[in-house]
UniProtKB/Swiss-Prot annotation:
Name this protein carries in UniProt: tRNA-specific 2-thiouridylase MnmA
Disulfide bridge map: C105-C203
Function: Catalyzes the 2-thiolation of uridine at the wobble position (U34) of tRNA, leading to the formation of s(2)U34.
One example of a Gene Ontology biological process annotation: tRNA wobble position uridine thiolation
Organism: Acetivibrio thermocellus (strain ATCC 27405 / DSM 1237 / JCM 9322 / NBRC 103400 / NCIMB 10682 / NRRL B-4536 / VPI 7372) (Clostridium thermocellum)
InterPro entries: MnmA-like (IPR004506), MnmA-like_C (IPR046885), MnmA-like_central (IPR046884), MnmA-like_central_sf (IPR023382), Rossmann-like_a/b/a_fold (IPR014729)
One Pfam family, short name: tRNA_Me_trans
């Protein structure tokens, strides 16, 4: 019987390197690949060094592939990355929302474009170094996405968009490992990326300065406007709505004699609404662009744990189906800084139920 083939998305980091090594040990025919996402200009030097697809990432991934003795490719996904990740990121900020580009990249680049490329090459699976577990439920006849064994590293929040058809062709071999075990495994294999630090920032934004990135990469005018309170009274001037996000207190550039927080961003009127901290809390939200994994669709209210951003703790909530395919999420206790444009992900224990984008 011929070996099953798997293309591993290699970022040059320790997680994807060890994922490739584990699959080799498990008897797969492994092919390494790094996504080329930067334009053909000097722009590529602007990618965050050490980021998941920078030039040094390609060098690191190639040397790991050589060490493991596997073929290695660099795949060109520049156009889809620009359209589905960078342009989406800019457009959302210009609309006064706060997007999560890593979720868009997973959805449109890794698990759509890269998977389709692999399948077109006659490869059975793609694999990544994500901390998550994929299983198959014989009773439900569905693939399930579950949290990794290590809660601090769990990455299921950014993976909720994967479909049943995609899950059939995805492997995530390090979901049962802790970060320490992954680093130890890399060391044991003699991979020099064993001690490489994790990438933290958005790969195409230097110094995490989103506002500066958008100003430099849009032809739209970033207009200053007014800070207003929740009653509409003018409090002062802001530098442009792209510089603010819900819940923000620092860096507002306005002194009001007491701490004030961004409560809402009104793109239509180019205003940033400020309020006291208690005004930043919300008991409910509406989500759209839903994807469900453990169920086919939401037909009746369901009790879940809901997570409103990557760094947030899960909170008890009930989700209700709405007629237009959206979902209403009602929390047991008010949540701080529910932010339009971010994703909300629903859990049932360690199982990902699904998720959507906050309206």
């Amino acid at each position: 019987m011929s070996k099953k083939k798997v293309m591993v998305g290699m970022s040059g980091g320790v997680d994807s390197s060890v994922a490739a090594a584990i699959l080799l040990e498990q008897g797969y025919e492994v092919i390494g690949a790094t996504m080329q996402i930067w334009p053909d200009t000097d722009e590529e030097t602007k990618l965050v060094e050490g980021g998941c697809c920078s030039l040094s990432a390609v060098d690191d991934a190639r040397s790991v592939a050589n060490k493991l003795g596997i073929p290695y490719y660099v795949l060109n996904f520049k156009d889809i990355f620009e359209k589905s990740v960078i342009n989406y990121f800019k457009d959302e900020y210009l609309k006064g929302r706060t997007p999560n580009p890593c979720i868009a990249c997973n959805r449109f680049v890794k698990f759509e474009s890269m998977l389709n490329k692999a399948l077109s090459m006659g490869i059975d699976y793609i694999a990544t170094g994500h901390y998550a577990i994929i299983t198959y439920d014989d009773n439900k006849k569905r693939y399930l996405l579950k949290k990794s064994v290590t809660q601090q590293k769990d990455q299921t929040y950014a993976l909720y968009n994967v479909t049943q058809e995609q899950l059939k062709h995805i492997l995530m071999p390090i979901g049962n490992f802790t970060k320490e075990q992954v680093r130890a495994k890399a060391k044991e294999l003699g991979l020099y990326v064993a001690s490489k630090p994790d990438s933290q920032e958005i790969c195409f934004v230097n110094d995490n300065d989103y506002g500066k990135f958008i100003e430099e990469n849009t032809d739209k005018e970033i207009k200053p406007g007014y800070f207003v309170d929740t009653k509409g009274n003018i409090l002062g001037k802001h530098r442009g709505i792209i510089h603010y996000t819900v819940g923000q207190r620092k860096g507002l550039g306005i002194a009001l004699g007491k701490p004030m927080y961004v409560v809402r961003i009104d793109a239509e009127n180019n205003t940033v609404v400020l309020g006291d901290e208690n005004e930043v809390y919300s008991k409910e939200l509406t989500a759209y662009d839903l994807n469900f994994i453990s169920i086919d669709k939401l037909e009746e209210p369901m009790r879940v744990k809901a997570k409103i951003r990557y760094s947030a703790k899960e909170a008890d909530a009930v989700i209700y189906p709405l007629e237009d395919g959206k979902v209403r999420v009602v929390f047991d206790t008010p949540q701080r800084a529910v932010t339009p444009g971010q994703s909300v992900v629903f859990y049932d224990g360690d199982i990902v139920v699904g998720g959507g984008i906050i309206q």
